[in-house]
């Protein structure tokens, strides 16, 4: 992970030498088989959205496990890749909430202060949750704890039971939580559709005197 403010803040919430354990895990994982995303993109979310600019967190579970899908940003895929089912539903809700967006690559959200973080940062090809419980959760929980310490408000968007459990780390009353069921086809009709997370996020940011996100960009 590139040295940054993120690096130092996250480190303070982890056991000693945990970064070394992560690097060892990555060396072994990428040497032993096909793993997504490409190794250079494992920490992309933290590289493209600096801590000081982060005002929204959208928490995913783990990267897409199909060829060329995962790019290090939760729910996002490269522009030339077909949208997976969860992203299709996210874009459908966005269209109903604010307006249509044709792009599958969510990098422009990340560049506006939306941290697109997965709880697990790697996945073996074809094995959803294949790296769950091995190394990543203490690290990404630490990211949430770092955000919780921010003096400026952050909107935490938590979709699904797994993400909603992370509310335990969000104790600072300055922050806001938007939660619903997950956008996956299995649960999207149980509260995700119609939840209007994008307009609600912007309403919160603007009420706090901050610039809203151009979700259609």
From Swiss-Prot:
Active site: 62
Enzyme class: hydrolase
Keywords for this protein: Cytoplasm, DNA damage, DNA repair, Hydrolase
EC annotation from Swiss-Prot or TrEMBL: 3.2.2.27
Compartment(s) of residence: Cytoplasm
CC annotations in GO: cytoplasm
GO terms (BP aspect): base-excision repair, AP site formation via deaminated base removal
Disulfide bonding pattern of the chain: none
Catalytic activity: Hydrolyzes single-stranded DNA or mismatched double-stranded DNA and polynucleotides, releasing free uracil
Pfam families to which the protein is assigned, alphabetical: UDG (PF03167)
Superkingdom, natural source: Bacteria
GO molecular-function terms, A-Z: uracil DNA N-glycosylase activity
Listed PROSITE patterns: U_DNA_GLYCOSYLASE
InterPro entries according to UniProt: UDG_fam1 (IPR002043), Ura-DNA_Glyclase_AS (IPR018085), Uracil-DNA_glycosylase-like (IPR005122), Uracil-DNA_glycosylase-like_sf (IPR036895)
Family of this protein: Belongs to the uracil-DNA glycosylase (UDG) superfamily. UNG family.
HAMAP family per UniProt: UDG (MF_00148)
Protein's job: Excises uracil residues from the DNA which can arise as a result of misincorporation of dUMP residues by DNA polymerase or due to deamination of cytosine.
Protein name: Uracil-DNA glycosylase
Organism in which the protein naturally occurs: Streptococcus pyogenes serotype M49 (strain NZ131)
Lineage: Bacteria, Bacillati, Bacillota, Bacilli, Lactobacillales
